Structure formats: structure tokens, C-alpha cells
């Protein structure tokens, strides 16, 4: 609501005020609640109407000229009888605007959103394996192949590293469902000390065991392996909501730094299997640089595909905070406005606006540090500056300011004011009640974001709006103080002018009361009050002006005002005239008064003057009389108008709260580039490890899902029997898959291919030898079975006995050879007989077994013949068959 006051005052009194008011262009509120006198326009009043009460602004409001014009209305006024009286108001107390401002002094601590990442120390354990193949031919070696990889170190070896500072030269690792071993320089395993690396930075230190690899030999190919055990001290960084962290090496670990298995609340984020994560209590770590053993702490270990990482276990609420202290303000002022508080920070030239309800800080997630930090800062400021002059008033209050700033405010009260307050409370026999603190439940701002674990304050990146708020508040305070002074001066001026009006009512009460009421009235002074009667409007056609202003019968006397004859109209208003209604058509003698008023009677006379020239207002125009005779009618526009009216439109500046306008959010600024570094690094690390889950290799699907689905089908449809059958199916499938996987792995090995090639060549050679033996057996079985029994072809015949001198000796030698040959033949026949007999028995047993199995599957009933045992094959029958 806006109210304006326009009052006609003299030029000299407001010459200074004009210059000030021209500069004030901001609209606000100004109301004046003056009380005065006015009409009670009831149609049941008498001819002289009683005066009721109207406001002073209503009385003088009609005097503000919208456009300079003269009303074409004429009124007839009767002499007041005293039935309606009025009085002028007394001077009033002038209010000062500055007295209404409620200010509270105190100490403020301003918090902002903590956008800094959480930084903590980690230790990286891994073995760097390098396999190099070189070629040399009595010349400089050439590298033909190189393979580099990193493998994690198991927990038991990490314990040895942290205790003794030594690491093994052997690396055992698992890749593609197989275990591998690597040895440094292809030598036997040994313990090597960890020595500092020359490559260091402010955020990382490294220790390793070797930097030398035997890469070549003088002649031929050489494949050499080096195993370097590396331990790195790094800084890791994690940002809210702390679901992963990154290291200076560029590696990212997809687990929260606050992850723990033993927790009662919701578990933190992790994509690793439980067996990869270890929590060790009272673990001691040796500083490899100084050799000192650190105090025991709870230690976390995580085994990744390429490294093992260790860090100290931490409590999330004790380690991180979503808010951080921005500034401390020893002299802060809280100004109370209609709907908000303004916290003015004079030293920082900033002002923050907030709601009037304190903010419930327990709603914030990970903001337990705020009360502690605020209390420590306020205690320090109070002890240094206010302990001897002020006392604290109430507890620390928190307010959420515009732009996402949390304000901790401690109210202060001077010793003198506090003593007066206590004395007043004791006098009233009760202690002062503190203002009830209400929580701002449900109050939402653009700076407060809700989450599953609690709310979080997001702070605007710029505080320019707070500086603008401070500037506006300073200008507002200055302008409002100036306007307050103007209003006070205006009030005092009205009081002084009221004294003048009291004196004017004694001289010309008609003009005074007409100007106050804004309409023609007739007034007469009755002691200290004024009798007032209302004037009746006379239509201009009911008025007849006379041309001469001379008094009939006396040539020396003339009328000072033009004379006229008028009559009241037949309108309902005529009933309020002094004449009766039945005489309304009779002419009434009168004179033209000031401001289009008709004076009943012709009592205003004066001695006639020479060169008389007068202008009298009638309706909208003026009547010109010269030598007391009407000359002509003059238009009002022909006469230059001089106005002394000055408008005073004093407006107080409104309360205005500046809010931050963020053109580009942080997310938009972060996404302005083509690539997002965090997303690229995380994707690259995940792609290099080739996992969907950290332990599920993409190419490691062996078809288990199909057989598992079959087993579930049996279990769901056949019940317990189906579950047992499904277990059998899964077992058989696992055996088949393992066999096939083993064969596939064997065939994929290059040594297996070489072994298979050698086996094929050996088999071919053995086959050719067997084929040659069979062909020789078919062509000459006696020679093959009994070598030497028959002389080979081309052997000269044995000489006859006649060529020998000693015939008896020759005959004896021949008989001996025959006996030896016969013995060999008999032994060979005996062996053949035994082999045939053995084969016949095996055949008979197999036939009986096959017959029994057929009867068993066919469920053939037993007969009496089946109860008799088979007769054994007699030995004499076998001998007869042989014969």
C-alpha cells in the first residue's frame, strides 16, 4: 500500500527539502495518520449540517491539484447558527523513523560449502614384471619383444615388507584362470632390500628392489625377466559423496575410503568382492625412509588386479565435513525486517539475508564439525574482545543465508543493559523468558539439496550479491534516515502551521474552514471553537448578475462585491436552505463572494473610488468591472496563474533482499569441455581391467549359466528329486567343462603343440616298423619267429662228410645241431599253445559276462539251468585239439 501526501507550504520553508526529494525515486510506503474535522453527510441533517470527524489527509487531500482548473460551481452559504461546531487539532508528537529499527549486535561465523576433496595417504604395493626378448649375432643386441605388467602383492608378503623392509624377487600372480611365476633375472628366489627411488614428488615417494635386467647374450635369442618390487607412498583424493578415490598415478579405486565390513548402518559403495578387502586391527607399518615403526592402527587392504593398496581406516563423520569455515566477524549486526533478518558484516562490506526462523543444523549430512568450529571461533573472539564489556545472550543460533551460506550468530548484550534487564525481571518477580526457538521445518531454498542420508548446502560460487546487499542496506539506512528527518521536520512544520491557523480562524474563519474542508462552508467563531454550516450549490442559471455595483439612492457609496439575485433550485438539497420549500421560486438578494460563494444580503459597501477596476470570479471565468460597471467576461486562460503549491512525495525505501543469480552452474562449467577428465580416467582404468564386476572377466564365461538354468529347472519342477538330479547334472557338466577347458588350455600352450608334433612323428615311425614286421612275418614266418633256424638265401651248402677226414667228429656235430633246432621248435610251439589257450579263456569269460549283462538289462527270469555252473574246459580236450 502506498500513500502520498501533497500539502501546500511556503517556498522558504521547503527550499532545502526540494533538492533532497528530487533524488528520492524509489517507491515505498508513507502514511500520515493525522486526525482533524470533517463533515457527516447524512441526509437527515438540518440546514446547518453538523460537522463529523474526518482524517486530516482526507481534509487536505482534495487540495492536491491534478490539473490547474476552476470549478464551474457556485454555492450559497447561510450564517451558521452553532448547531454544528468544529475545533482545530492540537500539535502532535513527531515520530522518528530510526527508532523503529530493531538491531541486535553479536558475533558471526559464516560457513560455506566444502568443495575441497578429502585427501589421505595410501600405500601402493605391486611388482613390476618386464619380459624382454633380444637377438644378437656377435653385434649389438636388438629388442624383438617386450611385455610389461603389474601384479599385486599378497598380504603375507606385505606384512614381511612392513616389518623388515625386504621383498622377494619372485612374483606369483593369477591371470586368465591360471597361476604364473616370474623370477628376477631368471634366478632363484631371494630377499632384496627396498631402496628409495630417484623419481619423487611432493605427493609421492617410491621404493623398489632393482633397476637392472640382463637383457641379451652374445649369440642368438635371449628372453630375460626382471621383477621389481615397488612400494609407493601416495596421496589419494576423494570428493563427495566419497564413492571412489583417485591417486597421483592416475589409477582410480572403485571403493569408498570409509568402507568397512563391520557397520550397523548402510554399507558404503564398493564393486569388489569381500575376499579382496581385508581389515586388520592393530597393524604396524614401517616407514621405509626413516625405518621407524608407526603406532598400531586399524589398516585396510584391497587387492586390485594390478596392485594392492593399503590405508588407515577412518570414521567418516570425524574425517570429512560438507561445510567449511569461511570468515569470522567480531562485529556483526542483525537487523530485523518484516519477513527476514539481514546480517550486516561491516568489515567485509557484505550483508546476508535469511529467514527469521533458526535453521536446524541436524538436518545436514556430515556437518557435525560445524558446532565445534563455530563454538571455538566465537569463544576465542569473545575472550579477546568482549569478556569485560558484554555478556552472551542465549545460545548460538544458525541461519541459512541466501546463496548457500550458513551463519552462526551469537547475540551479545552490554553489561549495563543486562543489569537493567535483570533488575526489571526481579522487580516483576519472574525471570526473563527467552524467545522460543522454532525450527524452520520444511523451509526450502535453492541452496539446500535433499539426499537419502540428509540435506546438503550448496554455496554459490560468488558473494557479489552479498556485497550488493550490503551496499543497498547502507543506502537504505542512509535514505531512510534522511526521509525520517524530513518526516520529522514536516511534522514540526505542521505543528507550527497549526498555530498560524489558530490565529487565522480569528480573522477569517470562512476561508480557513473552507480550505480545511475542501468545500465551501460558512463559519463563525464561537469562543475557542468554530460554528460551521454547509453551503448549498446554486445552479448558475438560477443566478442573475446586476451590471452596476453602485448603491441605489446614494451616489457616494458602492458595493465592494457584485450584487445578484438568485433562487434555490427544486433539487432535494434545497430543503437544507434557510428558506422554505414553498418559497424556492422567489428571488433572493445577495452578493458574489470569494471562491464562487454567494453571500446572502448586500452588506458589503464602500465609498466609491475613482478609476475603479476589479475582476471577480464567477464559475470558470472572471467578470470585469470598471468604475463599478460590468464591462465584459474574461476567460481564465487569459490571466497568467501563479501557483505556490509544492508537492512533497516522500517515500521510504522498501526492504529488498538480493538473491544470487547463477548463470552457469558448476555442472555446466565442468561440462563445457569436450572431455571430462574424471570420466575418461575411470573408463580407461575399467576398460584396461576388462571387467563387468571386478572378479568377472568378460571372456571367462564357460557356459555355466546354461547348466545352472537346467539345474534350476529340475529343482523347480521335480522338487527334491529334481534338486538331486540337478546336482548330478551340474557335477557332470562341471567335469565335462573342466575336461574340455583342460584340453583347450593344453592345446593353447605352445609346448603342448610341440609335444603333440613329436608324438605324431614317433607314432608314424613305430607304425612303419610294425608294418614291416607284419610283412616279414607273412613272407617268412619261420625265419622271423626262429631267426637262424633256416639259412638265408645265398648261403653256401653245408659240406659233405667225404671232405672231412674225421667222419665221426662231423657226424657228432651234425646231431648236436639237430637237437638244438628241435628243442627251439618245441619251445616255440609250446609258447604259441599257451598264448592261444589264454586268448580262448579270456574270450569265454567276456562272452559269459556279456550274456549276464544282457539278461540283467532284459530282466530275464532265472531258470534251473542257470543254477548249474559251467563245466571247465578239460586240459586233455585242449591237448587233443592241439594234436
UniProtKB/Swiss-Prot annotation:
Residues 694-748, 724-744 are annotated as: Hydrophobic membrane proximal region. Residues 428-457, 791-817 are annotated as: Disordered. A proteolytic cleavage by host furin generates two subunits that remain linked by disulfide bonds. Residues 134-140, 216-223 are annotated as: Involved in fusion and/or binding to host membrane. Glycans are attached at residues 102, 121, 211, 262, 360, 579, 635, 649. It is a single-pass type I membrane protein. InterPro entries: Glycoprot_B_PH1, Glycoprot_B_PH2, Glycoprot_B_PH2_sf, Glycoprotein_B_ecto_C, Herpes_Glycoprot_B. Pfam families: Glycoprot_B_PH1, Glycoprot_B_PH2, Glycoprotein_B. Keywords: Disulfide bond, Glycoprotein, Host cell membrane, Host endosome, Host Golgi apparatus, Host membrane, Host-virus interaction, Membrane, Signal, Transmembrane, Transmembrane helix, Viral attachment to host cell, Viral envelope protein, Virion, Virus entry into host cell. Its main location: virion. Residues 1-31 form the signal peptide. It is found in: Virion membrane; Host cell membrane; Host endosome membrane; Host Golgi apparatus membrane. One of its GO terms (cellular component) is membrane. The chain crosses the membrane at residues 751-771. A motif (Internalization motif) lies at residues 868-871. Disulfide bonds join 77-535, 94-491, 167-229, 321-369, 558-608. One of its GO terms (biological process) is symbiont entry into host cell. Residues 32-750 are virion surface. Residues 772-883 are intravirion. The keyword Methyltransferase does not apply. Envelope glycoprotein that forms spikes at the surface of virion envelope. Essential for the initial attachment to heparan sulfate moieties of the host cell surface proteoglycans. Involved in fusion of viral and cellular membranes leading to virus entry into the host cell. Following initial binding to its host receptors, membrane fusion is mediated by the fusion machinery composed at least of gB and the heterodimer gH/gL. May be involved in the fusion between the virion envelope and the outer nuclear membrane during virion egress. Belongs to the herpesviridae glycoprotein B family. Homotrimer; disulfide-linked. Binds to heparan sulfate proteoglycans. Interacts with gH/gL heterodimer. This is Envelope glycoprotein B.
Amino acid at each position: 500500500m502506498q500513500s502520498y501526501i501533497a500539502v501546500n507550504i511556503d517556498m522558504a520553508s521547503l527550499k532545502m527539502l526540494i533538492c533532497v526529494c528530487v533524488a528520492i525515486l524509489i517507491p515505498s510506503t508513507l502514511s500520515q495518520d493525522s486526525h482533524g474535522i470533517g463533515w457527516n453527510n447524512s441526509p437527515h441533517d438540518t440546514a446547518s449540517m453538523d460537522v463529523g470527524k474526518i482524517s486530516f489527509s482526507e481534509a487536505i487531500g482534495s487540495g492536491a491539484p491534478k490539473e490547474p482548473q476552476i470549478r464551474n460551481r457556485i454555492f450559497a452559504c447561510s450564517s451558521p447558527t452553532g448547531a454544528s461546531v468544529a475545533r482545530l487539532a492540537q500539535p502532535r508528537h513527531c515520530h522518528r523513523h530510526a527508532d523503529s529499527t530493531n538491531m541486535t549486535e553479536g558475533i558471526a561465523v559464516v560457513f560455506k560449502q566444502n568443495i575441497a576433496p578429502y585427501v589421505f595417504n595410501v600405500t601402493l604395493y605391486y611388482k613390476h614384471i618386464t619380459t624382454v626378448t633380444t637377438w644378437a649375432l656377435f653385434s649389438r643386441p636388438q629388442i624383438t619383444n617386450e611385455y610389461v605388467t603389474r601384479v599385486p602383492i599378497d598380504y603375507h608378503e606385505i606384512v614381511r615388507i612392513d616389518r623388515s623392509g625386504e621383498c622377494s624377487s619372485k612374483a606369483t600372480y593369477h591371470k586368465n584362470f591360471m597361476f604364473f611365476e616370474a623370477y628376477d633375472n631368471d634366478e632363484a628366489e631371494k630377499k632384496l632390500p627396498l631402496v628409495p627411488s630417484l623419481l619423487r614428488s611432493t605427493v609421492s615417494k617410491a621404493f623398489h628392489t632393482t633397476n637392472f635386467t640382463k637383457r641379451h647374450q652374445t649369440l642368438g635369442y635371449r628372453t630375460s625377466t626382471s621383477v621389481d618390487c615397488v612400494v609407493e607412498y601416495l596421496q589419494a583424493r576423494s570428493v563427495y559423496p566419497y564413492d571412489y578415490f583417485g591417486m597421483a598415478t592416475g589409477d582410480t579405486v572403485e571403493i569408498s575410503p570409509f568402507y568397512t565390513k563391520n557397520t550397523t548402518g548402510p554399507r558404503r559403495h564398493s564393486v569388489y568382492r569381500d575376499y579382496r578387502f581385508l581389515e586388520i586391527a592393530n597393524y604396524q607399518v614401517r616407514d621405509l625412509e626413516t625405518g621407524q615403526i608407526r603406532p598400531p592402527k586399524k589398516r585396510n587392504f584391497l587387492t586390485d588386479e594390478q596392485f594392492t593398496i593399503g590405508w588407515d581406516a577412518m570414521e567418516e563423520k570425524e574425517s570429512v565435513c560438507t561445510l567449511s569455515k569461511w570468515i569470522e566477524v567480531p562485529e556483526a549486526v542483525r537487523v530485523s525486517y518484516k519477513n527476514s533478518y539481514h546480517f550486516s558484516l561491516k568489515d567485509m562490506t557484505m550483508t546476508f539475508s535469511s529467514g527469521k526462523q533458526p535453521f536446524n543444523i541436524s538436518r545436514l549430512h556430515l556437518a557435525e564439525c560445524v558446532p565445534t568450529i563455530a563454538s571455538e571461533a566465537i569463544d576465542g573472539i569473545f575472550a579477546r574482545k568482549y569478556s569485560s564489556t558484554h555478556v552472551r545472550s542465549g545460545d548460538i543460533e544458525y541461519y541459512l543465508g541466501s546463496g548457500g551460506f550458513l551463519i552462526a550468530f551469537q547475540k551479545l548484550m552490554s553489561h549495563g543493559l543486562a543489569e537493567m534487564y535483570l533488575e526489571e525481571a526481579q522487580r516483576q518477580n519472574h525471570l526473563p523468558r527467552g524467545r522460543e526457538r522454532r525450527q524452520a521445518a520444511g523451509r526450502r531454498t535453492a541452496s539446500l539439496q535433499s539426499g537419502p542420508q540428509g540435506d546438503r548446502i550448496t554455496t554459490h560460487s560468488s558473494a557479489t550479491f552479498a556485497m550488493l546487499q550490503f551496499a543497498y542496506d547502507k543506502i537504505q539506512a542512509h535514505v531512510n534516515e534522511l526521509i525520517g528527518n524530513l518526516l520529522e521536520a514536516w511534522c514540526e512544520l505542521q505543528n507550527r502551521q497549526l498555530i498560524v491557523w489558530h490565529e487565522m480562524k480569528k480573522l477569517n474563519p470562512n476561508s480557513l474552514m473552507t480550505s480545511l474542508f475542501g468545500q465551501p462552508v460558512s463559519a463563525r467563531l464561537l469562543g475557542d471553537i468554530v460554528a460551521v454550516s454547509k453551503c448549498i450549490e446554486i445552479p448558475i442559471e438560477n443566478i442573475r448578475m446586476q451590471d452596476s455595483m453602485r448603491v441605489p439612492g446614494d451616489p457616494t457609496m458602492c458595493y465592494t462585491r457584485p450584487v445578484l439575485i438568485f433562487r434555490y433550485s427544486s433539487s432535494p438539497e434545497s430543503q437544507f436552505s434557510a428558506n422554505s420549500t414553498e418559497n424556492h421560486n422567489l428571488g433572493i438578494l445577495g452578493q458574489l463572494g470569494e471562491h464562487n460563494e454567494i453571500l446572502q444580503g448586500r452588506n458589503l459597501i464602500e465609498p466609491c473610488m475613482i478609476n475603479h477596476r476589479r475582476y471577480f470570479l464567477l464559475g470558470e471565468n472572471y467578470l470585469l468591472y470598471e468604475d463599478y460597471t460590468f464591462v465584459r467576461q474574461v476567460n481564465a486562460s487569459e490571466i497568467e496563474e501563479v501557483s505556490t503549491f509544492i508537492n512533497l512525495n516522500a517515500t521510504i525505501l522498501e526492504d529488498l533482499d538480493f538473491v544470487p543469480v547463477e548463470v552457469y552452474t558448476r555442472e555446466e562449467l565442468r561440462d563445457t569441455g569436450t572431455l571430462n577428465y574424471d570420466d575418461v580416467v575411470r573408463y580407461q582404468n575399467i576398460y584396461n581391467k576388462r571387467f563387468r564386476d571386478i572378479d568377472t572377466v568378460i571372456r571367462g564365461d564357460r557356459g555355466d549359466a546354461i547348466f545352472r538354468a537346467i539345474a534350476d529347472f529340475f529343482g523347480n519342477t521335480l522338487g527334491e528329486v529334481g534338486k538331486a538330479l540337478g546336482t548330478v547334472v551340474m557335477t557332470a557338466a562341471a567335469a565335462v567343462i573342466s575336461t574340455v577347458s583342460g584340453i583347450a588350455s593344453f592345446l593353447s600352450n605352445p609346448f603342448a603343440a610341440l609335444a603333440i608334433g613329436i608324438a605324431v612323428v614317433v607314432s608314424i615311425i613305430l607304425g612303419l616298423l610294425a608294418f614291416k614286421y607284419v610283412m616279414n612275418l607273412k613272407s617268412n614266418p619261420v625265419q622271423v619267429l626262429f631267426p637262424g633256424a633256416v639259412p638265408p638265401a645265398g648261403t653256401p651248402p653245408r659240406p659233405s662228410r667225404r671232405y672231412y677226414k674225421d667222419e665221426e667228429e662231423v657226424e657228432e656235430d651234425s646231431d648236436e645241431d639237430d637237437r638244438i633246432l628241435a628243442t627251439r621248435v618245441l619251445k616255440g610251439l609250446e609258447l604259441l599253445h599257451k598264448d592261444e589257450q589264454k586268448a580262448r579263456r579270456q574270450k569265454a569269460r567276456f562272452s559269459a559276462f556279456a550274456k549276464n549283462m544282457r539278461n540283467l538289462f532284459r530282466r530275464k527270469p532265472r531258470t534251473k539251468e542257470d543254477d548249474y555252473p559251467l563245466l571247465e574246459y578239460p586240459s586233455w580236450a585242449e591237448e587233443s585239439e592241439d594234436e
